UniProtKB/Swiss-Prot annotation:
GO terms for molecular function: glutamate-1-semialdehyde 2,1-aminomutase activity; pyridoxal phosphate binding; transaminase activity. Pathway: Porphyrin-containing compound metabolism; protoporphyrin-IX biosynthesis; 5-aminolevulinate from L-glutamyl-tRNA(Glu): step 2/2. It catalyses: (S)-4-amino-5-oxopentanoate = 5-aminolevulinate. It is found in: Cytoplasm. NCBIfam families: hemL, PRK00062.1. It comes from Neisseria meningitidis serogroup C (strain 053442). It holds the Pfam family Aminotran_3. The modification N6-(pyridoxal phosphate)lysine is found at residue 265. GO terms for biological process: protoporphyrinogen IX biosynthetic process. Homodimer. Belongs to the class-III pyridoxal-phosphate-dependent aminotransferase family. HemL subfamily. The keyword Isomerase applies. This is Glutamate-1-semialdehyde 2,1-aminomutase.
Length: 427
């Protein structure tokens, strides 16, 4: 029995399911999860000492590569001054100022510790600002695990959603409408029926939780026009896409100014840090200025802020995103060519340093499209690559990530392994 198996058995005896976040359990792909001992650059090593080229990137934060020396030094210096104060620091002002410079839609910003906190509070803030209760989210978009957002589609068009997790009362989700992503007709009908009651619309502007799904230009335009017309708050959940698909996030690519933005992952440089921000008039409804309550003992933690500030400095350097985008495109094009040569039905897409792999003829436009892809083929591909030292997220529904540490040569090596795997799948 190898170390991964030993540790998984040990973990299951004390941690529910053996993991602290469900996707890590390998439940959707089968097998034993790899317990990671260390990470550096584009690589991770498991407890057996096996090295993997990593395209998980801690689910997005590791944009500059794991254990980047400058980030590690910033964390070390900050830690020497104390781990947590429960009081304001200059660093939290500095990171808020930096984010506001990068994202013009962010006039005011509040730091929290997780993406779930950010989206949960943004929803509360939108409701407090508008005095309305109903919200719109889209099937397949994930916005953390707060009760009002753990919702799946109802039984019919524009019916209110049902809880997607045990322990969530139906009353908590009765104000949540779940619509199909990229479906403008549903969006228009929802506002026609309930426009005066809708507090906000929240979406992933590139969906990373049903692999990678792009919004159409018309869909994005309709979102902005309808929310403005009806006085609803448009929330871009950029926890995954912020600073990942472009320096200014998805909103900079769409040319959209959302009313509120949630962010996380990259802004913490691998440490627990997230934020929500946006229009001054909305943000000033938050306590202590307004009646919408939010607080957190570790919000703006100085160690996480130090990691985030250094990461933001690195990604703003000349050529960073041009190189990141080129490497990601090199990867997905290599995969397309390899799959086509093997006669495997497959396509791939990317934006910035984020990519999606689909065992289907066309990239999905919504959750239903993604659900029709060949999930079994993904499982075979996942294990074929993992067995050869290449790590992807253990779910067909998760996007992948490239970092600045992935060199062109390393991408070529990954594609060469994919050629072997696709040939084996076709045999």
């Amino acid at each position: 029995m190898n170390r991964n198996e030993i540790l998984f058995d040990r973990a299951k005896a004390i941690i529910p399911g053996g993991v602290n976040s469900p996707v890590r359990a390998f439940g959707s792909v089968g097998g034993v999860p790899r317990f990671i001992k260390k990470a550096e650059g584009a690589y991770v090593w498991d407890e057996n000492g096996t090295r993997y080229t990593d395209y998980v990137g801690s689910w997005g934060p590791a944009i500059v590569g794991h254990a980047h020396p400058e980030v590690v030094e910033a964390v070390r210096e900050a830690a020497l001054g104390g781990l947590s104060f429960g009081a304001p620091t200059e660093g939290e002002i500095a990171i808020a100022e930096q984010i506001a410079k990068i994202m013009p839609s962010v006039e005011r910003l509040r730091l929290v510790s997780s993406g779930t906190e950010a989206t949960m509070t943004a929803i509360r803030l939108a409701r407090g600002f508008t005095g309305r209760d109903k919200i719109i989210k889209f099937e397949g978009c994930y916005h953390g695990h707060s009760d009002s957002l753990l919702v799946k589609a109802g039984s019919g068009l524009l019916t209110f959603g049902n809880p997607s997790s045990a322990g969530v009362p139906a009353d908590f989700t009765k104000h949540t409408l779940v619509l199909e992503y990229n479906n403008i007709a549903q969006l228009e009908e929802a506002f026609a029926q309930s426009g005066n009651d809708i507090a906000c619309v929240i979406l992933e502007p590139f969906v990373g939780n049903m692999n990678l799904v792009r919004p159409t230009e018309a869909f994005v335009k309709a979102l902005r026009e309808l929310t403005e017309k009806h006085g609803a708050v448009l929330i871009y959940d950029e926890v995954m896409t912020g600073f990942r698909v472009a320096l200014g996030g998805a909103q900079s690519l769409h040319g959209i100014m959302p009313d509120l933005t949630t962010m996380g992952k990259v802004i913490g440089g691998g440490m627990p840090l997230a934020a929500f921000g946006g229009r001054k008039d909305i943000m000033e409804c938050i306590s202590p200025l307004g009646g919408v309550y939010q607080a957190g003992t570790l919000s703006g933690n100085p160690i996480a802020v130090a990691a985030g500030l250094k990461t933001l400095e690195i990604i703003r350097r000349e050529g960073f995103y041009e190189n990141l985008t080129a490497r990601t495109e090199q990867l997905v094009q290599g995969f397309r060519t390899a799959a086509d040569a093997a006669g495997i039905e497959f396509t791939a897409d990317s934006v910035g340093g984020m990519f999606g792999l689909y065992f289907a003829a066309h990239a999905p436009r919504n959750y239903a499209d993604m659900a029709r892809s060949n999930i079994d083929a993904f499982k075979r591909f996942f294990h074929g690559m993992l067995d050869r030292g290449i790590a992807f997220g253990p779910s067909a529904y998760e996007a992948g990530f490239v970092s600045a540490a992935h060199t062109p040569e390393l991408i070529d090596e990954t594609v060469a392994v994919a050629v072997e795997v696709f040939k084996a799948m076709a045999a």
